[in-house]
C-alpha cells in the first residue's frame, strides 16, 4: 500500500486507556504529567476517562467503557485521523473479556502509524521526547490511492 504524510500538530489529541488493574498506574502517571498534558486534547475510554477527569481536573472526552465499545470508538477515531497518539496501560498477565477489541485497537494504531506507549516507561519517553511539543510528519496509508486501486 502506498503512503502519504499526515501532520501531528504540537497540540496533540491523546487517547488514554487502561485495563482495570492498571487504572491507578495511569492515574498516577497522569497526575505526574498533568501540566504537560493540559494543552492537549485528551480522550479516554469511559471508566478511565471519568476517573482521570475527577481526580486530575483535566478536561477529558470520555467515550464508552472499553468492553462496551470504547476501544472500537477509539479505533474509529484513529482511522479518521482524530487521535495522534495513545497511552495504553494494559495488563499482560490478565485476559480481558474484550481482548479481540483490544487487539483490533492496537492493530488500527499500528496501521495508522500513531505513537503508542504501553507502560509507564514508554509513556515517559513519548511525553519527554522533543517531538512531543512540535509539529511532526508521519507516514500513513494513502486510503484514497488504496480505494482507487480497489475500484479500478
From Swiss-Prot:
Catalytic residues identified in the record: 71 (proton donor/acceptor)
Binding site for substrate: 19, 23, 45-48, 65-66, 98
Record keyword Lyase present: yes
Reactions listed under catalytic activity: dihydroxyacetone phosphate = methylglyoxal + phosphate
GO biological process: methylglyoxal biosynthetic process
Keyword terms: Lyase
EC numbers: 4.2.3.3
GO annotation, cellular component aspect: cytosol
InterPro entries per the UniProt record, alphabetical: Methylgl_synth (IPR004363), Methylglyoxal_synth_AS (IPR018148), MGS-like_dom (IPR011607), MGS-like_dom_sf (IPR036914)
A Pfam cross-reference name: MGS
Location of the MGS-like domain: 6-152
GO terms, molecular function: methylglyoxal synthase activity
Taxonomy, superkingdom: Bacteria
Coiled coil: none
Function: Catalyzes the formation of methylglyoxal from dihydroxyacetone phosphate.
PANTHER family referenced in this protein's UniProt entry, alphabetically: METHYLGLYOXAL SYNTHASE
Similarity remark: Belongs to the methylglyoxal synthase family.
NCBIfam families reported in the protein's UniProt record: MGSA, PRK05234.1
Protein name: Methylglyoxal synthase
Organism, as annotated: Haemophilus influenzae (strain ATCC 51907 / DSM 11121 / KW20 / Rd)
Lineage: Bacteria, Pseudomonadati, Pseudomonadota, Gammaproteobacteria, Pasteurellales
Amino acid at each position: 500500500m502506498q503512503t502519504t504524510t499526515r501532520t501531528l500538530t504540537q497540540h496533540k489529541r491523546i487517547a488514554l486507556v487502561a485495563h482495570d488493574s492498571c487504572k491507578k498506574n495511569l492515574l498516577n502517571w497522569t497526575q505526574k504529567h498533568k501540566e504537560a498534558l493540559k494543552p492537549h486534547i485528551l480522550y479516554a475510554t469511559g471508566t478511565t476517562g471519568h476517573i482521570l477527569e475527577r481526580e486530575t481536573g483535566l478536561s477529558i472526552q470520555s467515550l464508552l467503557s472499553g468492553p462496551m465499545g470504547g476501544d472500537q470508538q477509539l479505533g474509529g477515531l484513529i482511522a479518521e485521523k482524530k487521535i495522534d497518539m495513545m497511552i495504553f496501560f494494559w495488563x499482560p498477565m490478565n485476559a480481558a473479556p474484550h481482548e479481540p477489541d483490544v487487539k483490533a485497537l492496537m492493530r488500527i494504531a499500528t496501521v495508522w502509524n500513531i505513537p503508542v506507549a504501553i507502560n509507564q516507561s514508554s509513556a515517559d519517553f513519548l511525553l519527554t521526547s522533543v517531538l512531543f511539543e512540535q509539529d511532526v510528519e508521519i507516514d500513513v496509508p494513502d486510503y484514497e490511492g488504496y480505494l482507487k486501486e480497489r475500484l479500478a
